[in-house]
């Protein structure tokens, strides 16, 4: 993880740790001129590692985004941001996207009252995301919400921390996407 962060820069979804300031300078000095291929590859790898995707999953999302109306890049980022694991991360119910994936895989999360155990589940506007009524599930989410720094919540999400409930209001606006892609 730390090698990826050092190579690609800060990836907020992967871990809360940041690369040291000196390591970035060393990489720039050593790297020389960056080709177009290298720039594109690094941006693709940023997407993959930030959202925890395989190569095949990313290609599928690119294919869907290419067919949709509008800018392919913006549509791609909207698709990725509307994944259940990413929405849990944005709501503050998990400290990282891999942590959110684990919550979903272990069946702690309900969407519209139904257990969803697929992290790539695509959330839609007006979806209600809650935790199971079990004490263990509520304790996990409570710890994450209490320990996470209260960052500003994106406009497309609302959270009720006392009921452990999140609501997807609309599709994400491009200014709220936390990852800087070239």
Curated annotation (Swiss-Prot):
Keyword tags: Chloroplast, Plastid, Ribonucleoprotein, Ribosomal protein, RNA-binding, rRNA-binding
UniProt-annotated location(s): Plastid, Chloroplast
GO biological process entries: ribosomal small subunit biogenesis; translation
Signal peptide, first to last residue: none
Role description: One of the primary rRNA binding proteins, it binds directly to 16S rRNA where it nucleates assembly of the body of the 30S subunit.
GO cellular component terms given for this protein: chloroplast; small ribosomal subunit
Chief place of localization: plastid
Assembly mode: Part of the 30S ribosomal subunit. Contacts protein S5. The interaction surface between S4 and S5 is involved in control of translational fidelity.
InterPro entries: Ribosomal_uS4, Ribosomal_uS4_bac-type, Ribosomal_uS4_CS, Ribosomal_uS4_N, S4_RNA-bd, S4_RNA-bd_sf
Residue stretches making up the S4 RNA-binding domain: 82-143
UniProt protein name: Small ribosomal subunit protein uS4c
GO molecular function, one term: structural constituent of ribosome
Segments passing through the bilayer: none
Keyword 4Fe-4S annotated: no
Species annotation: Isophysis tasmanica
Family recorded in the similarity comment: Belongs to the universal ribosomal protein uS4 family.
Annotated Pfam families: Ribosomal_S4, S4
